[in-house]
Amino acid sequence: MRGWRWLAPAVVVLLAVTAWPVGRAVWTSLFTDPLPGSADRAFVGTDNYTAIVSSRTWWEAVATTLVIVVLMVAVQLAIGLAFAAALRRVGRPWPIAQLLLLLPFGLLAIVSAVVWRDAVTTGFAAQWFGLDDVGPFGALVAVCLGEVWRGTGITTLILLAGLHRVSPSLLASAVADGATSWQRMRRVVLPAAAPALAVATVYRALDAFRILEGPILVDDPGATVRTAPFLVWDTTFSSLELGLGAAMSIVLLLLAAVLAAVLVQLLRVRRIV
């Protein structure tokens, strides 16, 4: 109960900021597409939600989003853990290393997507690997790599904070007992850094679940990689189906909540959080 007292101010602010837009989206989702105040606007109840549940396009977009989430989180955790271990071994990270790690994440998502698009279409990556026409799979890989490039830095810093929780005396005892590097990592380092791993996993998974900029810019736009957030954007702003787009945004919000709950439960089962 004491922990909730510390969380209460942040929860109140979060609810105050999100209550109006979420409520407005729910209200909009109950009507047909014309703009509010239009004479052609009609109440349709849950028809938009029924259309989403029965839409193959929607569930294909959700599946694509989940594939991206799994790939991005796995790669970011692996690279981030390797970088964090290297920085911990060096000692105090160099300022230039911190800058290079956080620079992609510090950019606006749309800016980093533009940088990555130029790299894989007309820049160094296109010249090195001959990326003239990468196809659907190549577009998916390009989108994933762009997000990995943007998010690995913050993942590294989260994991580095977790690695600093490892007691040097405990590592020295493991070395004295003859433990190998892999045994020390598995038996000593990872259990101590487990809370940081949990935070990084949930944070990066939810961030990956809202991926939009990559499919719009790298894939020109959404030609082969159609994620659920992209479908919401395309339905709302390109097709101007406001009611259906609002319903999609609510369903996407619920799916993100389910994803977070599942991840937290899995981490609790493994006694990580």
Model-identified regions with their sequence ranges:
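A structural signal for multi-pass alpha-helical bundles of membrane permease subunits
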Residues: 3-273
